[in-house]
């Protein structure tokens, strides 16, 4: 039986990545969809070889600067030896898309706060990562809740 993903649903998702290519380009971990809210439950980072670090952030709207595509850092691991694991299990949520920009940055009213929640644009927000060195090899396991409020 297929998993229901329509409006009004809430499902637990998991995604697994083996990041061993030889570059340090930004990598999309979760791609936001309009009127969805993503609550990340855990990110497990396993160093397959000795690794410099891994940086994870949300790429989205900055409610202070009123800027689109801002990198809001969540964590950066320390260097890990081969076979070591870093677990980030602080819960956080982010909206699937950016809001309509408001002109009185920083956020100062309930109406502006509602604009953020309304997700009135189609500009996706992302959970992203990048590794510290092109020789780093990371295995990631991400568990999250996807709430579809369309």
Each predicted region: which residue ranges?
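A short acidic, glycine/proline-enriched capping/turn motif at secondary-structure boundaries
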Residues: 83-84, 134
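Compositionally biased, low-complexity repeat tracts
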Residues: 2-4, 65, 77-79, 92, ...
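Beta-sandwich interaction modules
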Residues: 84-126
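C-terminal interaction-tip segments
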Residues: 1-35, 46-55, 112-150
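Solvent-exposed serine/threonine-rich low-complexity stretches and specific carbohydrate-binding patches
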Residues: 13-17, 71-82
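Short, surface-exposed beta-strand/strand-loop-strand elements in extracellular ectodomains
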Residues: 50-76
